[in-house]
């Protein structure tokens, strides 16, 4: 299967979960390009991934902040995984951060796993950092921005739940966020506004992903 044909309708294919990675030694061998999604707990990360590939229940959603503490790998189904028949890319759902009253050892383990992955994964093409439109960039997000800058990984801000605020407030938030990103050398300048519930901004996000892995 050629790369161009594998990208045709990739977001409409059936997607499957292939692996949870609790520690860096469990990472799959480097293969296709990887796109990672990061964000605070309950930012709507799982819902956005599910909406992106039009498949409810692929990435598990939870009302319990910090439930998932692994790197979860998803790929489109129908590829053998052998040389010449790799999926066009993999989606990596990173653990949520910023949950209240987290034990220090859990935070340290999360930080070590994430930084090791970011710094050492040559197939990682971009991290999409999700920010809740109702709250903007918070202190925990700033810490992750610094981590991404330190790892020198390309990342892009995706605003979630943008249907929950008025259009003028969203425009103001985008301007404020763009100004903040001027201090972050690894940040991609364009900000994407999305809503999983209303399917808003999903086509723009899909296009951005395909452009990133092209």
Swiss-Prot record:
Transmembrane regions listed in the UniProt entry: none
Source lineage: Bacteria, Pseudomonadati, Pseudomonadota, Alphaproteobacteria, Hyphomicrobiales
Origin superkingdom: Bacteria
Function per UniProt: Necessary for normal cell division and for the maintenance of normal septation.
Recorded GO MF terms: GTP binding; metal ion binding
Gene Ontology process terms (BP): division septum assembly
Key words of the record: Cell cycle, Cell division, GTP-binding, Magnesium, Metal-binding, Nucleotide-binding, Septation
Matching CDD domains: YihA_EngB (cd01876)
Database matches in NCBIfam families: GTPase_YsxC
Keyword flag Transferase: no
Cofactor: Mg(2+)
Domain EngB-type G: 31-214
Protein's recorded name: Probable GTP-binding protein EngB
């Amino acid at each position: 299967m050629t790369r161009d044909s594998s990208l045709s309708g990739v977001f409409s294919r059936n997607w499957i979960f292939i692996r949870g990675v609790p520690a860096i030694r469990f990472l799959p061998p480097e293969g296709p390009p990887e796109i990672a999604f990061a964000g605070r707990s309950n930012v709507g990360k799982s819902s956005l991934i599910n909406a992106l590939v039009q498949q409810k229940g692929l990435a598990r959603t939870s009302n319990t902040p910090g439930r998932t503490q692994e790197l979860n790998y998803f790929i489109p189904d129908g590829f053998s995984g052998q040389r010449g028949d790799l999926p066009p890319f993999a989606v990596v759902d990173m653990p949520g951060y910023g949950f209240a009253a987290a034990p220090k050892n859990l935070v340290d383990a999360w930080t070590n796993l994430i930084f090791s992955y970011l710094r050492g994964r040559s197939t990682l093409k971009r991290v999409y950092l999700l920010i809740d439109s109702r709250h903007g960039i918070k202190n925990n997000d700033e810490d992750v921005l610094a981590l991404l800058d330190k790892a020198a990984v390309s990342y892009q801000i995706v605003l979630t739940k943008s249907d929950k605020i008025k259009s003028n407030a969203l425009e103001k938030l985008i301007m404020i966020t763009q100004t903040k990103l001027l201090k972050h050398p690894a940040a991609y300048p364009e900000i994407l506004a999305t809503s999983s519930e209303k399917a808003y901004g999903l086509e723009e996000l899909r296009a951005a992903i395909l452009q990133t892995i092209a």
